[in-house]
């Protein structure tokens, strides 16, 4: 079944839809922007890219759908864990998408998603308030 036909079926009635504040969002896997649109839908396309946080809380997992074996959902996804520094991680994602000519329209969205995940994994520095000495008159 073509992606366009699947989109016509899924776009208004899906268990992943969230309709709030005059906007429609989607919680489906491999939807990089969580937006209910044809381009970012993670279910209907033959090629999809997903970026998730790693299970141990360090690094990201890039999920790419295989072009072959579409009829076997259990083996149709390849999961690659990238646990490097931020610049190398983003460079790896960029190369995975660009060098394989794999959905170049999703390249920037995947990089932004990975960047946000890496930023959320950084430890937060607690700022201490400076105490002023009391004035003595």
Swiss-Prot record:
It is found in: Cytoplasm. One of its GO terms (cellular component) is membrane. Component of the large ribosomal subunit. The modification N-acetylserine is found at residue 2. The modification Phosphoserine is found at residue 115. It holds the Pfam family Ribosomal_L28e. Component of the large ribosomal subunit. The ribosome is a large ribonucleoprotein complex responsible for the synthesis of proteins in the cell. It comes from Homo sapiens (Human). The keyword Cell inner membrane does not apply. One of its GO terms (molecular function) is RNA binding. Keywords: Acetylation, Cytoplasm, Isopeptide bond, Phosphoprotein, Ribonucleoprotein, Ribosomal protein, Ubl conjugation. The keyword Disulfide bond does not apply. Belongs to the eukaryotic ribosomal protein eL28 family. This is Large ribosomal subunit protein eL28. Its main location: cytoplasm. There is a cross-link at residues 58, 65 (Glycyl lysine isopeptide (Lys-Gly) (interchain with G-Cter in SUMO2)). The gene is RPL28. It comes from the Eukaryota. Disulfide bonds: none annotated.
